[in-house]
Amino acid sequence: MKTVLISYETVSPAVLAHKIERAFACMTKYREVDEDTYEFSVFGCTDLAMLEDLLAEYV
């Protein structure tokens, strides 16, 4: 499992979830932390190095 905090200004959580679920065939979940930030979690990803590279674009 990998969890990061991302700003709503950077990317919509629904768009990011769709992109990651299609690319890595895994499950995602997100929840609002405050009005500007959400917590995004990824479960069941086998290629964590590539996932971290992708998430680094948004953090």
Cite the ranges covered by each PLM segment.
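Short amphipathic alpha-helices in soluble, non-transmembrane regions
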Residues: 19-23, 50-59
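Short amphipathic alpha-helix segments
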Residues: 7-27
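Intrinsically disordered, low-complexity segments enriched in polar/charged small residues
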Residues: 24, 34-36
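Conserved short beta-strand edge segments in small beta-sheet-based binding/regulatory domains
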Residues: 28-32, 56-59
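A generic structural motif
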Residues: 36-44
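Short structural boundary motif marking the start of a folded domain
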Residues: 1-4
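Generic structural signal for short, flexible, solvent-exposed coil/loop and linker residues
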Residues: 19, 29-31, 40
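Helix N-cap motif at beta-to-alpha junctions
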Residues: 9-14, 43-49
